[in-house]
A protein has these predicted regions:
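Hydrophobic alpha-helical transmembrane segments in multi-pass integral membrane proteins
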Residues: 4, 76, 82, 142-146
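Transmembrane helix boundary and interhelical junction motifs in multipass membrane proteins
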Residues: 4-8, 87, 200
Length: 359
């Protein structure tokens, strides 16, 4: 399914910030996989190639093959570093290890079992990885629901997520200003998936190493069937984390180390004021949420609507303060652009609320 630890750790942040709308980016993937299974696979097997770039060499020349392979290795090398970095943050914090040492040790372990075991070892570990990801999703959902206020269950959480517009998965708007829509996800996602699954060796090697054309196609179809539901579950987890942080005080900026570093470099009083304002709005929002839920239980529609409107107003103020915090952090890193902390939303939840033995 092309998923990795970085998918599980970072994508919930998208669900936290923008809801389920990010799922539309994957709508084109099933169509791309069908095209690859029908056209790309038979062509690769007919030419008896072992890499996508070997095909470039046979179709064009060795220079084209080397250019494609070199660009792939550069891109994958950078991507692998990020993939190792995210889980290393969690492991180093839980066990008290050095972050640099954890990254190096993880890289060495991966290199050893990959070189020693080849594609068989990679396929085997990917099966375990998928099991761990699904088990982790279930465990995170269970802990989330368990830590919600007493008498507040999953249905109540879904009510809040829906009321706060976090469950709007599909947008058919033709607007070019909307970030995630059905049309951009289907059309753009189709070509992105074609390029990734059809030409990226990290994916091509998976179906070229299978025993037959039929097995390769079955693998792609399995991917197409499970890709969207899996991503939906991860995004829903992010939406539930949003609900959780309506009751538990969240940090104004989830990358706490970056926030502390910028505070030490700038004016600490300004950073504390941002934190105090954010906490005050969160406390008031909690009052309005309780008012909304109580009115909803009584069936008082007008009172519930009034409380929901006030909650939306407070959420807008909260978002504005978080945006200001991102600008304050980003101002010291990349000019005037806001820094992003979405990748740290789920990591923060894991480190602060999940039992370390479960991690």
């Amino acid at each position: 399914t092309q998923a990795s630890a970085i998918t599980f750790l970072s994508v919930p942040g998208q669900g936290f910030e923008s809801g389920l709308g990010f799922i539309q980016n994957y709508f084109g993937a099933p169509f791309a996989l069908i095209i690859i299974a029908a056209i790309f696979l038979p062509l690769f097997r007919k030419l008896n190639v072992y890499t996508a770039y070997e095909f470039l060499g046979k179709r064009f020349d060795s220079k084209t093959r080397l250019l494609g392979a070199g660009l792939f290795l550069l891109q994958r090398g950078l991507g692998a570093g990020i993939t190792i970095y995210a889980p290393a943050i969690v492991l180093s914090t839980v066990f008290g290890w050095s972050l640099d040492g954890t990254i190096i040790a993880s890289g060495i372990v991966v290199i050893i079992y990959t070189v020693a075991g080849g594609s068989d070892a990679v396929s085997l570990t990917q099966k375990y990885q998928m099991a761990v990801i699904f088990a982790g999703m279930i465990a995170a959902f269970a802990v989330l629901i368990w830590k919600l206020p007493s008498g507040f269950g999953f249905s109540n959480a879904m009510t809040i997520a829906s009321g706060m517009n976090k469950l709007n998965a599909v947008d058919f708007s033709p607007s070019l200003q909307t970030r995630y829509t059905f049309w951009s996800g289907t059309i753009g996602g189709l070509f992105l998936a074609l390029s990734y699954f059809g030409t990226d060796q990290s994916q091509v090697q998976r179906y070229l190493s299978s025993g037959s054309l039929r097995e390769s196609r079955l693998g792609l179809m399995f991917n197409g069937i499970f890709k969207i539901p899996m991503q939906f579950g991860i995004l829903l987890l992010g939406a539930m984390i949003f609900v959780f942080y309506q009751f538990e005080p969240p940090p104004v900026y989830f990358n706490q180390s970056a926030w502390a570093e910028r505070a030490s470099q700038g004016e600490p009083e300004q950073f504390r004021k941002i934190e105090d304002d954010f906490a005050a709005i969160h406390a008031e929002k909690r009052v309005q949420l309780d008012r909304w839920m109580e009115a909803d239980r009584r069936g008082d529609t007008s009172e519930a609507d009034a409380a929901l409107t006030e909650t939306h107003s407070l959420q807008k103020q909260s978002d504005e303060i978080r945006q200001q915090a991102k600008l304050m952090v980003g101002g010291g890193i990349k000019g005037n652009k806001p820094a992003s902390d979405a990748d740290y939303v789920f990591i923060t939840f894991i480190l602060n609320y999940l039992p370390h033995g479960l991690i």
